[in-house]
C-alpha cells in the first residue's frame, strides 16, 4: 500500500508515475473522499471539543449547586450529531482504505518505462543454447517415456496437473534439495517449513487480496461466531511461499540489528490461472499446482536495491550450477507485478519453443507490503520504521525440470543428469526410458 501522504501532497505526480504502469488513478474520486474526510474530521473534533467543554462546565455548575440544565440539554443534542458525524467519518475512512488497497506500487526510478513485456530490457545472458543433431522433442514427449504422466492426473483431478513417476520424480526431488542446500549453505538463508493454507489477513498483507482473489483457491471453513452460530471464514491455498514467509513479520517490530532476515522454503503453490485460459495448455509450464523454492528477505530501506541484486544472483546460481542457458531481464513499468517497485525476471532456454521462458522472478516491494502488514524495525530506542521486503523464486521446480528434460535430452530418448544433480540422485548419470 502506498503512503497516503504522497497522494495528499502531490496526487498528480503519483498519478503520472502510476500511468507508466498502465494504472489510471481516479484522482477526482480520491480528492472528493479526502475533502469529505477533512470536513467530517474537523466537524467531529469540534463537536468532541464542545462536548468536553460543556461537560466541564456542567461539573462546575453542579459543584456550585447552580442550574446546569442548559449545558446538559446542549450536550444531549451534541451526542446524536457527534455519533452521526463519527460514523460517517469512519465510513469515508474505510472507503479511502479500500481504494488505497487497489492502487499498485510506484516503479523505482531505475525501472525502464514501457507498455508491456516487449519493452523489458535484457541485462545479461549466460550460456549458449545447445545445437542438436537430431529432432528436438518437447518435455511432454521426452517425459512421457520417463514417468511424466498428464493423462492420469487429468483422470484423478483435471487439466493442468501432473503425476511424476520414477526417475523424473526423483529428479524433481533432487532439484529441491540442490536449491535449498545452495540457498541455506551458500547464501545464508534460514530454511522454513510453512503452512500451505493462510488466512485473509496474510493474503492482504502481501497484496494478493483484494485484487487477485479470482486467481486463488479459496477454502471456506466454519468457525464459531460471537452469537454462538457458525460463521464462514475464508482461508486460501498459498499461491507462493512468499505469503507465509513475508507475513512472519506482520504486526511485528524487529530489532534493527537482527536485519536482514533471509528465509527460504520449498512448498507446493496453487493458482487458479483464471486469466490464463488457452495459454501453455500443453505440459508443465503452467499448472494449477506446482512446486517452488522461494526466497524472502526483510531489510532496512537503504539496503533494498542492493538486496534485490543479491537475490537475483542467488537465483541465477542455481541455473549456473545446472549449466542451463538463461537470460535476465529487468521488467518495464507496464509489465511489473502489482506490489513490485522493481523486478528482474530470469528466463531459461527452452529448446522446443526456441525461446527463453520465465523460471524466476525477483522483486523488491519497497515498503509496500510492510505498510499493509505494519512490519517495522527499530534501531535502539528510536522510532519504529517500515522495513522493506523482497521475494524471489529460487527456482520454480517444475519449470527447471522442463528445462533439463529438453536441454539434456538424447537421441535415444534418455536424459543426461546434470553433474550438479548427480550427488542428489545416487550417482545416476542418465534417466533411461521406461521399458
Curated annotation (Swiss-Prot):
> Which PROSITE patterns does the record cross-reference, listed alphabetically?
AA_TRNA_LIGASE_II
According to its UniProt record, this protein's enzyme class is: ligase
Which InterPro entries does this UniProt record tie to the protein? aa-tRNA-synt_IIb, aa-tRNA-synth_II, aa-tRNA-synth_II/BPL/LPL, Ser-tRNA-ligase_type_1, Ser-tRNA-synth_1_N, SerRS_1_N_sf, SerRS_core, tRNA-bd_arm
Pathway per the UniProt entry: Aminoacyl-tRNA biosynthesis; selenocysteinyl-tRNA(Sec) biosynthesis; L-seryl-tRNA(Sec) from L-serine and tRNA(Sec): step 1/1
Subunit architecture: Homodimer. The tRNA molecule binds across the dimer.
Q: What is known of its domains?
A: Consists of two distinct domains, a catalytic core and a N-terminal extension that is involved in tRNA binding.
Please give the name of this protein.
Answer: Serine--tRNA ligase
What species is this protein from? Cupriavidus metallidurans (strain ATCC 43123 / DSM 2839 / NBRC 102507 / CH34) (Ralstonia metallidurans)
Amino acid at each position: 500500500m502506498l503512503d497516503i501522504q504522497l497522494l495528499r501532497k502531490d496526487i498528480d505526480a503519483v498519478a503520472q508515475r502510476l500511468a507508466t504502469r498502465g494504472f489510471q488513478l481516479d484522482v477526482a474520486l480520491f480528492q472528493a473522499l479526502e475533502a469529505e474526510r477533512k470536513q467530517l474530521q474537523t466537524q467531529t473534533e469540534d463537536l468532541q471539543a464542545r462536548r468536553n467543554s460543556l461537560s466541564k462546565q456542567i461539573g462546575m455548575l453542579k459543584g456550585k449547586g447552580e442550574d446546569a440544565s442548559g449545558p446538559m440539554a446542549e450536550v444531549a443534542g451534541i451526542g446524536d450529531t457527534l455519533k452521526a458525524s463519527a460514523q460517517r467519518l469512519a465510513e469515508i475512512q474505510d472507503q479511502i482504505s479500500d481504494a488505497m488497497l487497489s492502487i499498485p506500487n510506484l516503479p523505482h526510478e531505475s525501472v525502464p518505462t514501457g507498455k508491456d513485456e516487449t519493452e523489458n530490457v535484457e541485462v545479461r545472458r549466460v550460456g549458449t543454447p545447445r545445437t542438436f543433431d537430431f529432432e528436438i522433442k518437447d518435455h511432454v514427449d521426452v517425459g512421457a517415456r520417463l514417468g511424466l504422466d498428464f493423462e492420469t492426473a487429468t483422470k484423478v483431478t483435471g487439466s493442468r496437473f501432473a503425476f511424476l513417476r520414477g526417475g523424473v520424480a526423483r529428479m524433481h526431488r533432487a532439484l529441491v534439495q540442490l536449491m535449498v542446500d545452495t540457498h541455506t549453505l551458500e547464501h545464508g538463508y534460514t530454511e522454513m517449513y510453512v503452512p500451505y493454507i493462510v488466512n485473509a489477513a496474510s493474503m492482504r498483507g502481501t497484496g494478493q487480496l483484494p485484487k487477485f482473489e479470482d486467481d486463488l483457491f479459496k477454502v471456506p471453513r466454519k468457525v464459531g461466531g460471537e452469537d454462538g452460530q457458525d460463521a464462514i471464514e475464508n482461508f486460501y491455498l498459498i499461491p507462493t511461499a512468499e505469503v507465509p514467509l513475508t507475513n512472519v513479520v506482520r504486526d511485528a517490530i524487529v530489532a534493527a540489528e537482527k536485519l536482514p532476515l533471509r528465509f527460504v522454503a520449498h512448498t507446493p503453490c496453487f493458482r487458479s490461472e483464471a486469466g490464463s485460459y488457452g495459454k501453455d495448455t500443453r505440459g508443465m509450464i503452467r499448472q494449477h499446482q506446482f512446486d517452488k523454492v522461494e526466497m524472502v528477505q526483510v531489510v532496512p530501506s537503504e539496503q533494498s536495491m542492493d538486496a534485490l541484486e543479491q537475490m537475483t544472483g542467488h537465483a541465477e546460481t542455481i541455473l549456473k550450477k545446472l549449466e542451463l542457458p538463461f537470460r535476465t531481464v529487468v521488467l518495464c513499468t507496464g509489465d511489473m507485478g502489482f506490489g513490485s517497485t522493481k523486478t528482474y525476471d530470469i528466463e531459461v532456454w527452452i529448446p522446443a519453443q526456441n525461446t527463453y521462458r520465465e523460471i524466476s522472478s525477483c522483486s523488491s516491494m519497497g515498503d509496500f507490503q510492510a505498510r499493509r502488514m505494519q512490519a517495522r524495525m527499530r534501531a535502539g530506542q528510536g522510532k519504529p520504521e517500515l522495513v522493506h521486503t523482497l521475494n524471489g523464486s529460487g527456482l520454480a521446480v517444475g519449470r527447471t525440470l522442463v528445462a533439463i528434460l529438453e536441454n539434456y535430452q538424447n537421441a535415444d530418448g534418455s536424459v543426461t543428469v546434470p553433474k550438479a544433480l548427480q550427488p542428489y540422485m545416487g550417482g545416476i548419470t542418465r534417466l533411461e526410458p521406461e521399458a
